[in-house]
Amino acid sequence: MYSPQLLDHFQNPRNTGDLSNADAVAELENPVCGDVIRLSLKMQAQRIEKIRFKAKGCVPAIACGSALTEMVLDKTVNEIRRLRRDDLIAAVGGLPQASSHAAQLALDALSNALDQIESPRSAKPQGN
């Protein structure tokens, strides 16, 4: 059974779609289950000004993508780097152990996008 918070993020996902002129874009796929998440973000004054996601996969994958975008909006890269899987799992009201990979996939995609922000000369947008 899923929590009310998780179901709300699944049924009413926030910050969906792509950003035009994104500062970073990252897309990851879980090769085991096939879940895919794509994040695009814009920075302003060292903070995430806008973030959007697209996800294809299980209920937790979509809910975690939605919750993550709310968690990181207007946060600095340093603040975001301190987020852990358990923080995202708590934000969706918990996940079954078998679904914790959904939270990790969203965080890994975000980490890849942040790597692009921190190393713009060496990183290339992923998933294009």
Language model: regions and residue ranges:
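Short beta-strand elements
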Residues: 30, 35-45
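Short, thiol/selenol-centered motifs that function as redox-active sites or metal-ligating centers
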Residues: 33, 55-64, 102
